[in-house]
Amino acid sequence: YLTLMGMLRGENEYTYPPYNAKQATELITCLREMAPYVIIDCGSYIANDILSAIALMESDAVLRLVNCDLKSISYLSSQLPLLRDNKWDADKQYKIASNIKPNEASEHVEQVLGSVTFKLPYSAELAAQSLAGDLLADLSLRESRGFRKAIEAISREVFGC
């Protein structure tokens, strides 16, 4: 089974009252009791996002995805001093060069991150599904094979399946 939780169309971070670290911790604890695996898509601005900060601290594993474009690499460079703090436990972080397009060099990400654990290639099929709001559809095109294989490798490493 797959359960998704998120905001409805038209909602944003100001739709609901603010919450604190204790409430974020309680939410994650409750989710862990309900499901064997909990995946939280954290925001990139963790200094002001309590849920993302708590999720990063409480997690068993962190997948840190970074696109190979200049904007993503520059932003990550500015956040690395914060992410290297001991409270974020760098040993449980998997570094992933993500959405690698043929004309982009993942080596630039590796210069900033150090070695990456996985590389996720760009998939036009996935991009089309994202635009259509159909992210749960199968990726069936041949050009998506590299993406599927990378996701399988990540699943084996992180979830043991």
Q: What are the roles of these predicted feature ranges?
A:
Residues I50-A55, I73, S78-Q79, S106-V109:
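A short acidic, amphipathic alpha-helical/loop segment
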Residues L2-T3, E33-I40, A61:
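Loop/turn-to-beta-strand initiation segments
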